[in-house]
Amino acid sequence: MDEISLQQGVRRIQTGVGCIDALLNGGLEGGIITEIFGEGGSGKTNICMIASCSAMSQGLKVIYIDSEGLSPERFLAVCRSDISMFKLFRVYSLDDQEVAIMKASKMADRDQKIGMIVLDSFSEFFRLEKSDDRQARIAEFQRQLSLLSSVAAKKNIPVLITNQIYQDIDNGTLLPFGGFLVDHAMKAILRIEKMPDGRRRITVTKHRSVREGVSAMFRITDDGVSCEG
């Protein structure tokens, strides 16, 4: 148990993307999980990479758990920070993912310089694995979210995760995978949409300190992303 002062300021880590930082009142909030969801190729991984580089430029170490096949070439193209501050775990299964989350939690306990944990993407293996035991999958889902929430709160660092989407068969809307279980654990949720002109719109759909519905536009570029009106 920790005693918390209400006068303690909110810690925020800049993402390195000006319009997104403005949207979030200064950056990713410490102590909580922020979820970014959107269709494939919408820019979720780009935001994760740039946010990681921004944290490192602020003197913080980053743990990055990758299930998407992070491109080293792309990472080095967008990152001009000291990559010795970057710890990458590539995971290949749901069990791998849980082990990586536990390792990240222990590392954050030992090293005060760790300032961000990224998981891209959280739902990849939950979506792909075919298990007959639905309750066991739900329990694992909850356990991993609990571990991430705990390390974020204890160390007052942002945890950034990405999520896949699915189409609701009843109304055709695109929703983040995991439904209520994921939504309940998130204190901040951002949706990225592709625009017909190639730009991306990022919208706050849930946040404990930012008005829902506010949005910004950006475009993916060779060396990162650029904000656009």
From Swiss-Prot:
GO MF entries: ATP binding; ATP-dependent DNA damage sensor activity; damaged DNA binding
The name this protein goes by in its record: DNA repair and recombination protein RadB
Source organism per UniProt: Thermoplasma acidophilum (strain ATCC 25905 / DSM 1728 / JCM 9062 / NBRC 15155 / AMRC-C165)
PROSITE patterns: RECA_2
Family: Belongs to the eukaryotic RecA-like protein family. RadB subfamily.
Disulphide bond pairs: none
Database matches in Pfam families: Rad51
PANTHER family listed in its UniProt record: DNA REPAIR AND RECOMBINATION PROTEIN RADB (PTHR22942:SF47), RECA/RAD51/RADA DNA STRAND-PAIRING FAMILY MEMBER (PTHR22942)
InterPro entries given in the database record: DNA_recomb/repair_Rad51_C (IPR013632), DNA_repair_and_recomb_RadB (IPR011939), P-loop_NTPase (IPR027417), RecA_ATP-bd (IPR020588)
Binding site for ATP: 38-45
Key words of the record: ATP-binding, DNA damage, DNA recombination, DNA-binding, Nucleotide-binding
Biological-process GO terms, alphabetical: DNA recombination; DNA repair
NCBIfam families: recomb_radB
Stated role: Involved in DNA repair and in homologous recombination. May regulate the cleavage reactions of the branch-structured DNA. Has a very weak ATPase activity that is not stimulated by DNA. Binds DNA but does not promote DNA strands exchange.
